[in-house]
Amino acid sequence: TTNFGTCNPGAVCPSGMMRVVPGDVRRSDQNKYDKDSRWWSTPYEFHNVFFTGYSHVNLSGVGCPDLGSLLVMPTVADTLCVDFRQYGSAYTAEQARPGYYANTLTRYGVKTEVTATPRCAVHRYTFPGGRSHILLNLGEGLTNETGATLRRTAPNEVVGSKLLGTFCYDARQAVFPIYFVMRVERKGLAAGYWKFQRPKKGVEAEWDPDDNKYKLYTRYAKELSGDDIGAWFSFDAAAGEQVEVRLGVSFVSIEGARRNLEAELSGKTFDQVRAEAEGKWNEDLSRILVEGGTEEEKTVFYTALYHLLLHPNILQDTDGRYPLMEGDGIGTVPAGHNRYTVFSLWDTYRNVHQLLSLVYP
């Protein structure tokens, strides 16, 4: 998580498509490292302090930026703010375990917790009370691509897609969408969109109160597209109120993301999902039992084994459908099988694939 290791804490299952990571590398003079001021390929850096939301579907240990999008952020303020440079917060009280991550946003007094299934994320926010907001930012991310689409399908739900790709800046045509369904598990929500309005000149700039600013859409609820857009949900929270956010993804379709959400999260609480994720990690990490050595040496070993099992990732939805490479086709894996992606051959050919074949065939 530091010294350019590009590893991250966060919530993920072994080989999971979904990986929820705290984001603290976006444009703040409070941070030591900034993703837009240097070569940077990870959503998190241990020494940084300015948190701007949780990103979904992330890479680990890579040398080029991609993915790291769909940023979700809780805030508390009388006036809604959707500019990440202004709504970000310092954070403290980090906790990280396999399948779970938590921190406390010091600016807002909000405790944030995240856990994951193979294809979905569950957030749990504990609010101090007062006017509270949950933001979905589609304009920011580690990807080198821009462009996203949103549509509100229920008072507490938005669906859409975001373009990803152009890994390492040179694979210019290697782009693809990620689809999502996000629900805020609370009634009595005000909701809307935002979009950054490009600057105008002359009288147009004088007449437009949203010129070169984020425009809030409080009544429009149809489809919205753009490079720097997002969705907001606002409500009056009671002191200590907990609100869950559930987000499912798919590389096939919005319908696939919805099926994943229903199949993996229906009827389950945050704590149940967390326990299942921890159980998956215990099962896979226990494939190798270490005898002897110090506790520190065991910690180093199992941390390395944990990192081994982050990639490759499953690519197919719960119905077996997945996108074919270098085309628009959709494939289907046989029942009981997985389709994997993020196979790296850069140095991993030395020992990673042999170990996976022997211990996790």
PLM feature segments, named:
Residues 1-361:
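Accessory carbohydrate-recognition regions in carbohydrate-active enzymes
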